[in-house]
From Swiss-Prot:
It catalyses: (+)-(R)-germacrene A + 3 reduced [NADPH--hemoprotein reductase] + 3 O2 = germacra-1(10),4,11(13)-trien-12-oate + 3 oxidized [NADPH--hemoprotein reductase] + 4 H2O + 4 H(+). Disulfide bonds: none annotated. Its main location: endoplasmic reticulum. This is Germacrene A hydroxylase. Heme binds at residue 432. The chain crosses the membrane at residues 7-23. Pfam families: p450. Belongs to the cytochrome P450 family. CDD domains: CYP71-like. It is found in: Endoplasmic reticulum membrane.
Amino acid sequence: MALSLTTSIALATILFFVYKFATRSKSTKNSLPEPWRLPIIGHMHHLIGTIPHRGVMDLARKYGSLMHLQLGEVSTIVVSSPKWAKEILTTYDITFANRPETLTGEIVAYHNTDIVLAPYGEYWRQLRKLCTLELLSVKKVKSFQSLREEECWNLVQEIKASGSGRPVNLSENIFKLIATILSRAAFGKGIKDQKEFTEIVKEILRQTGGFDVADIFPSKKFLHHLSGKRARLTSIHQKLDNLINNLVAEHTVKTSSKTNETLLDVLLRLKDSAEFPLTADNVKAIILDMFGAGTDTSSATIEWAISELIKCPRAMEKVQVELRKALNGKERIHEEDIQELSYLNLVIKETLRLHPPLPLVMPRECRQPVNLAGYDIPNKTKLIVNVFAINRDPEYWKDAETFIPERFENSSTTVMGAEYEYLPFGAGRRMCPGAALGLANVQLPLANILYHFNWKLPNGASYDQIDMTESFGATVQRKTELLLVPSF
């Protein structure tokens, strides 16, 4: 029987893919260890049905902490140990300093002109300098202290108004709190359409999580349309662009001292100067970073900290005793009151170890061919550092899966990427530039929630019944919302 035209075309397409796959596979002489692969999709079948960071961690434990994965068209190195993280993020840091191009970056992030996705080069270096000296400096983060304190107090009042003994949706409340803090830091006021804005940010994060068909087959443009990804991202971008345009149009640049500048003030000042000229799209891309990278990560960290404390009553009691003893009945908490509270900081460190905000960090890309430990790595190979696996490596951490804040007592370990067994914000040139802001947005809200209220699970459930299931996405979120009952 003669083959139909459709079948012939489909068969020819499959044979073409198989040929390309076979010829590409033979081109690399010294290949890294890898699982068995299939034509066309490569190793994707090993990750189907898994949470990506856990699926990759399980493969690394079988095939090695430096392994290769073929994700569709994309050749990928996966690093899952402190040893290889240190080697690559120091010796080969500049070699892997680029970002892979993605459909999300192209459409949503204004052609990859934000801080996170910008390709390595002069523009990115200027952005990094802008973050270090202006947007995310310690001084600038400190300047937002009063608004953090005010919004945290508003949250406390809102929870009290809901009544003692009634369940509170902490997931919703915490996300709203962080979004409000960041919107005031960026624009000097809350966003009128904040609910719509935060929903758009959440949808962007959902679209960037995992391994999307558009990203594993970047050259197959028809798949971007067939999967509906391009249409979804275009729709998201149009809504987002309209919202940000309105916010910028409503904003009046202050003529006061730099210490009172909002983040948008800084960007508009630089946009109109020769110091570091920015386009309107550049400004919007950077503003998006402040929310996309800041809201979800900080709120998730607070949620996980509270979840772990509910699950571990001993640690919950210890941190609350420390807070209440230090504050001694004080009504409002100021940041100076909690800077030296050691156990609170241990709780945050341990939460970031078990639940790093970006478990696979942001992928990097090789800028040139390189020989790594005897293995030939082609140009444009993607690099994934599995921080989730590194932070739980049993060779470096005793009882690695257990929440034990005391493990950091008398330890010089910091969150800033100096110790490669603990990388909550990554390391090297492309390390998260917003670590200081993120920590400030975690510490004070967490202290307020723990100081003012005692918490328990609804319906008389015991502490060990809390659902700790993770969701699928760019950040490690709880799968279910955190509903707890306050008493005060």
